[in-house]
Regions:
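N-terminal Rossmann-fold NAD(P) dinucleotide-binding loop
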Residues: 187-188
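Conserved glycine-rich cofactor-binding loop
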Residues: 183-184
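Conserved glycine-rich Rossmann-like NAD(P)H-binding loop of the short-chain dehydrogenase/reductase
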Residues: 199-212
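Domain-length cofactor-binding catalytic modules of enzymes
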Residues: 1-171
Length: 231
């Protein structure tokens, strides 16, 4: 649902990972969840890569696609207003895409988001470190970040933006391919071709013992028997 909403907002395809390990769910049940993670970034990488704060959606609204769309739309509008207010601090700054890279789903986990698997993983790694710092800081005091003017200057620092804007975006960014018989020579050759085009690949086969390790590390491998209806 959220991947489709992102596509509707941007006309691009996105890679989204649902993080629901015990520690990922635990922090989303905090009573101070909505106040703890809206205070700004911990380091420059946080604001540059995943915005200064995540989008947090209350549990009671998670089952409504309309509500989800409204929350994302509100986040976008808030970000655009932030850019409009502070753009005077960086001459000739151009707005980055305003979509959240982290969405916290109260009570069930969080989503890490990117235009490809690598970007999605960067979103996860940065937020995972960020939340640990904020939670630990609050054990001894209260976490406080820099003000919005300085956040904007950091986020739109021209040299950093130039580096991000010059990233090559391949035609098939954000697409996902599922290959049956993926551990065989033909399946792995197809997978390798897709990987080179920035397509995220899921391989299905009975086992992956003989699969090239370089292919295996770049794909999601699911062991299954497609002839077995019980699977």
């Amino acid at each position: 649902c959220i991947r489709n909403l992102y596509h509707l907002f941007t006309n691009k395809k996105w890679i989204i990972k649902f993080n629901s390990k015990v520690e990922d769910v635990k922090f989303t049940n905090r009573k101070d969840l909505f106040n703890l993670f809206n205070k700004g970034p911990v380091t420059p990488d946080h604001v540059i890569r995943i915005k200064s704060e995540p989008l947090i959606i209350p549990n009671k609204h998670l089952s409504s696609s309309k509500k989800l769309s409204n929350y994302i739309d509100a986040y976008i509008k808030k970000y655009k207003n932030y850019f409009k207010k502070y753009k005077k601090n960086i001459i000739n700054s151009k707005i980055a895409d305003p979509l959240p890279r982290i969405i916290i789903l109260e009570g069930i986990g969080f989503l890490s988001i990117g235009l490809n698997k690598k970007e999605m993983q960067v979103s996860f790694d940065i937020f995972d470190a960020m939340k640990k710092v904020i939670i630990k800081a609050n054990l001894v005091s209260k976490f406080k970040s820099i003000n919005n003017t300085d956040i904007f200057k950091m986020e739109y620092w021209p040299l950093e933006r130039a580096k991000l804007n010059n990233k090559n975006s391949k035609k098939f960014n954000g697409n996902v391919a599922v290959i049956t018989g993926g551990a065989g020579k033909i399946g792995s050759a197809i997978a390798n071709k897709f990987i080179n085009e920035n397509i995220e690949v899921i391989l299905l086969d009975k086992n992956f013992k003989n699969l090239d390790i370089n292919i295996k590390e770049k794909c999601l491998c699911i062991a299954c028997d497609l002839t077995n209806n019980s699977q």
